[in-house]
Amino acid sequence: ELRDVPGMPKIDLMSYNQLLRKKSLPRATYVFTDFDRIDFWTRELAAKAYRCLTANNARALNDPASARTRLPMLKKLQGEGLNSFSVWDAEMDGLPDRYPVFLRTRAAHRGTQTELLTTPEEARSALDELVRSGLCLSDLMFVEYCAEPIEDGLFRKLAAYCVGDEVITGMSVHDENWHAKYGKEGVASEAHYLDEMQAVKENRHAAGIAGHFKAAGISFGRADFTLVKGKVEVYEINTNPNNSLILDHPFPLRVETDALFHQPLAEAMRAIDTETGGDPILMDHPDLVSQRKRDGYLTRPRWTP
């Protein structure tokens, strides 16, 4: 977790259930996350809370009202020429008109749900099978294949973190499979890890990916991306990224690289930190007040209009 990283400021966690029951909040920096995992009304109320904070000059990152989730974000990135690959809403857009593609869910972080599909017939069959299995049509999307091996049979997925105004090149993963979701131990060489270290030292990808965060309306998160013909191609931006320290590795230089990466990350987190003290901030938006009155005595909220 970020809280385990040396030099990090104090980080407290708060669920949306806890947030929306608060009559006031202490002055602090607030980071809103996980919009693909909450329902529409919780997100709308969170946006009202965000506005209570910013109206009182509190620092808040990731506006719930405007931050884009996976499908609209990827459509936006392609529309602005920042990404070159297409995506299709399986419910609204019909079958893709470019191949190969794969299916995945719009929400959560479950990775690909199919291998590559090369024809409309394969796409239709795969979509029908996933729906029969219980996945919701409204949560499925087609994604055009966009990957390029860095050498024969080896794929690399890159990462960059946005913290306020700072973008920081992160650690990479290597895999023999184009998914490259978690990486596979033993497939990368020392030369690959030396290149990773150099990328972290020079913050190689910050300039090339800053515009993607801005277009997505995200000021805190991790972009997972690759390079295809030298061009950045962003797969997703996770507003609540998993982060773990590398304490042991067959190549010790990876441990060193991980420490080098976490130094500027901690510095960026300290830069957005807020000093404690001052008057609390009232969560006095009428919708928040009304919701608290309705649900104040329930153990579980019924977050509905």
Regions flagged by a language model, labelled:
Residues 101, 141, 168, 221, ...:
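Protein kinase-like catalytic core scaffold
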Residues 40-51, 71, 123-128, 256-266:
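Well-ordered, non-membrane alpha-helical segments in soluble/globular domains
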Residues 159, 222-224:
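Short, surface-exposed charged micro-motifs
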Residues 95-113, 135-152:
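ATP-grasp fold ATP-binding core
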Residues 218, 227-305:
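C-terminal active-site "lid" helix and adjoining low-complexity regulatory extension at the edge
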Residues 90-92, 145-149, 224-226:
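Short, solvent-exposed loop/turn elements at beta->coil junctions and helix N-caps
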Residues 1-98:
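Conserved N-proximal alpha/beta basic substrate-recognition cap immediately N-terminal to
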Residues 118-204, 208-213:
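Phosphate-binding site of ATP-dependent enzymes
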